[in-house]
Amino acid sequence: LQFTAALAQRLTAEGAELWLDTTARRLLGGPAGVEGVETSRGIIDADAVVVAAGSYSPALTRRFGLRLPIEPVKGYSVSIPLHGIEGAPGMSIIDDARKVVVTRLGEQLRIAGKAEITGFDLRLDERRWRAVREQGLSRFPRLAEQLADAPSQPWAGLRPMTCDGPPILGPTPISGLHLATGVGHLGWTFAAGSARLVADQLEERTCDLDPAPYSLQRYG
């Protein structure tokens, strides 16, 4: 939250206009390419548009005949308040055997994991999120005892997975349309680097990173 708040402050100071709580309904344009976006707050005219809509990116690009090899993969997280309890890990821990991640976020513990191919179904399966909680706490038996009666806040989200793993970053065959999507479960990890790579290509600057492995053209 602190990072995103600081980033928003920096962007607005540089002249960016942030439209929060706004839905991007469809891309606008025609044979010449993309010319803007229709949103729940009105139309934005643009010479270039970056689609960074995660699992919903294919729905936006389909109108221009561009089919993206991205599928939603559902994951769960469970947040548990600590209320001053000691013994919680001070850094993120990945349990590769159980496929869960345990992270302390201030005064709460967040456990995330699972991978379900269920389309865009975001319903919370209690069996699944309780399994995530149990698996995450199993490495910390004393902490598990202390949190046995603590409330849980479950959540489910969709990871935009490409068919080969890496994200899709950069221009498309459609004039004015660029992509920053398909980051899978590494959205936060890849965010800043993806933005830099896409921005460099938009501005036709030399990229510090070879863009070819992330280009849509790799699919032929």
Curated annotation (Swiss-Prot):
Q: Which InterPro entries match?
A: FAD-dep_OxRdtase (IPR006076), FAD/NAD-bd_sf (IPR036188)
Molecular-function GO terms, alphabetical: D-amino-acid dehydrogenase activity
Which cofactors does the annotated protein need, by name?
A: FAD
Under which name does UniProt file this protein? Uncharacterized oxidoreductase in pyp 5'region
Q: Recite the UniProt keywords alphabetically.
A: FAD, Flavoprotein, Oxidoreductase
Family membership noted in the UniProt record: Belongs to the DadA oxidoreductase family.
Where are the disulfide bridges? none
Q: Which GO terms describe its cellular component?
A: cytoplasm; plasma membrane
Tell me, which GO biological process terms does this entry list? D-alanine catabolic process
State if Flavoprotein is listed as a keyword. yes
